[in-house]
């Protein structure tokens, strides 16, 4: 909880961490067992970002501010809801030591917004689509994870949702069975309202997961 909140909010900031941990080590030196756990918990909670600041950051462009922490949180939500039938090693890395599962922007993040997305997100208004991109593209409600990011990219929403492997035997789009996609897979279009609503859902989950 402490490290997720700290990485998202930068509270306390990095330069204070060394002294914080040194003070905690000194305080628990003569303690044992649960007493150590309690002291560590209490000292970290005192300096941790309060709920209001944490929630505000979660509702903002969280990917733009900290993509690594965002990936960790999304993968943690997914891992908490995995079943034996649908399991994936979300922490696996490829031969280049990069994560196999990466963040996917549902509404594409690139500055050159595809025509299909201008039409869907802003009823054909290119200027409005650009503004929506600035306001919402990096918010958590517009994010999921995928092992096939390069295969989705700037595709239309329908194509991203229904994408299959080349041999047509595997769902590699939003129908891949992930918990994170359960409120995306049945949508016929992706809009700002749906991004906002999904942000509400995911923020609530994260506030509960990383609650003191």
Sequence positions of predicted segments:
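Flexible coil/loop and intrinsically disordered segments
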Residues: 1-212
């Amino acid at each position: 909880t402490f490290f997720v909140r700290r990485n998202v909010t930068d509270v306390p900031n990095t330069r204070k961490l060394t002294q914080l941990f040194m003070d905690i080590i000194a305080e628990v030196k003569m303690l044992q067992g649960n007493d150590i756990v309690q002291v560590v918990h209490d000292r970290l909670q005192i300096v941790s970002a309060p709920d209001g600041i944490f929630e505000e950051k979660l509702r903002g462009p969280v990917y733009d501010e900290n993509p690594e922490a965002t990936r960790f949180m999304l993968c943690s939500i997914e891992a908490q809801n995995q079943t034996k039938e649908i399991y994936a090693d979300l922490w696996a890395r490829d031969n280049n030591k990069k994560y196999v599962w990466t963040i996917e922007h549902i509404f594409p993040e690139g500055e050159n917004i595809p025509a299909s997305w201008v039409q869907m997100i802003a009823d054909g208004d290119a200027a409005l689509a650009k503004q929506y991109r600035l306001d919402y593209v990096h918010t958590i409600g517009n994010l999921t994870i995928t092992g096939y990011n390069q295969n989705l990219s700037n595709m239309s929403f329908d194509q991203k949702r229904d994408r299959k492997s080349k041999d047509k035997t595997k769902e590699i789009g939003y129908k891949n069975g992930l918990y994170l996609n359960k409120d995306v897979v049945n949508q016929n279009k992706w809009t700002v309202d749906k991004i906002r609503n999904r942000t509400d859902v995911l923020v609530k989950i994260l506030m509960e997961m990383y609650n003191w």
